[in-house]
Amino acid sequence: MILGSLSRAGPLPLLRQPPIMQPPMDLKQILPFPLEPAPTLGLFSNYSTMDPVQKAVLSHTFGGPLLKTKRPVISCNVCQIRFNSQSQAEAHYKGNRHARRVKGIEAAKTRGREPSVRESGDPAPAGSIPPSGDGVAPRPVSMENGLGPAPGSPEKQPGSPSPPSVPESGQGVTKGEGGTSVPASLPGGSKEEEEKAKRLLYCALCKVAVNSLSQLEAHNKGTKHKTILEARSGLGPIKAYPRLGPPTPGEPEAPAQDRTFHCEICNVKVNSEVQLKQHISSRRHRDGVAGKPNPLLSRHKKPRGAAELAGTLTFSKELPKSLAGGLLPSPLAVAAVMAAAAGSPLSLRPAPAAPLLQGPPITHPLLHPAPGPIRTAHGPILFSPY
């Protein structure tokens, strides 16, 4: 009973007591390695001496997630081109294509800014020449030597004076440094025209656009530019004439598009400046300037060799001898004719002359007299085979 009571009373207090919660075990103390992914690589003692491929595999397996570095975008906003490397971008920025695009954008901005500047300022009086600068309104650009507006430009300012014509005597053109033709001081805005030509890099005389000032200077020193300039002024071998006859003294000189040009070197006449430029660029004119013979004239003339010339001389020397031997009778024939004439009864008759041409004798049937009452006797037949 006592044991039973003890056994009954013993477990009851144990059941009545609340269970004691044990603190959780620290996993870091149990595990021999930490859970962080990066220090996991420290387990490999020879990690620093491993192959790069093995390092990459271990880093990918045990390491943290690799952050993908965003590739920088290299592009040109002007030309709308994307590059793969910085070297490609640098090569593109140094090229002519990028430079032309940038220059075109700057020129467009300048043209768009010029009208606004002109409208904001005071209106220029009629007939006045605007100063050279960024606020100049666009108009046909003249060439560097200041010979007036470009040929073929129909628009002219109503108040601006007409460009002065270049005299034929060449007083308006002087020689400058380097042998280039530089115009003398002309009334008007010649300096402004030169500045415009240099700023816009355009030759209105030849209608040529260049990329730099050095190219423009080289073009102005070229043969084509000088030839067209001399043709306009009439100082070179190419002369300019009015198309409808000589101008009157009071009228101004006709423009270039209303004149004809004559090239004294090639003896060619053209009707416009466009045809003149084509002729100057042709091979015929270049060969004529260089002193070469005209290929059109010498195309059908073949040079005669020394053998042909010697054969011609030999033939000309032997020709009189052969003709004399064929036309003149031989001495034996003359002697036979004289002997036959002396032995014949009709010795008083003059002996017939020997035949000029040595050949077969005349056949017998041709020597019969003509039929009729009158029959003339003929002399003896010499050298007859019958």
UniProtKB/Swiss-Prot annotation:
Residues in Matrin-type zinc fingers: 74-98, 201-225, 261-285
Chain positions found as Phosphoserine: 185
Expression triggers: By p53/TP53 in response to DNA damage.
Region listing for Disordered, in residue ranges: 88-193, 279-305
Cell compartment(s), UniProt: Cytoplasm; Nucleus, Nucleolus; Cell projection, Dendrite
GO cellular component terms, semicolon-separated: chromatin; cytosol; dendrite; neuronal cell body; nucleolus; nucleoplasm
Biased composition (Basic and acidic residues): 103-121
Tissue expression pattern: Expressed in brain and testis (at protein level). In brain, the expression is located to olfactory bulb, cerebral cortex, hippocampus, satellite cells and Purkinje cells of the cerebellum molecular layer. Detected in bone marrow, white and brown adipose tissue, lung and at lower levels in the thymus.
Traits of the deletion mutant: No visible phenotype at birth. Between 2-3 weeks after birth, some lethality is observed, may be due to internal hemorrhaging mainly in brain and gastrointestinal tracts. Surviving mutants are fertile and smaller than their wild-type littermates. Deficiency alters hemostasis which is associated with a block in the formation of alpha-granules in megakaryocytes and abnormal platelet morphology. Mice also exhibit tremor, ataxic gate, tilted head, severe impairments in motor coordination and motor learning related to cerebellar functions.
The protein's role, per its UniProt record: RNA-binding protein that affects the localization and the translation of a subset of mRNA. May play a role in adipogenesis through binding to the 3'-UTR of CEBPA mRNA and regulation of its translation. Targets ITPR1 mRNA to dendrites in Purkinje cells, and may regulate its activity-dependent translation. With ELAVL1, binds the 3'-UTR of p53/TP53 mRNAs to control their nuclear export induced by CDKN2A. Hence, may regulate p53/TP53 expression and mediate in part the CDKN2A anti-proliferative activity. May also bind CCNB1 mRNA.
Subunit note: Interacts with p53/TP53; the interaction is direct and enhances p53/TP53 transactivation functions on cell-cycle arrest target genes, resulting in growth arrest. Interacts with ELAVL1; the interaction is indirect, mRNA-dependent and may regulate p53/TP53 expression.
Protein name as catalogued: Zinc finger protein 385A
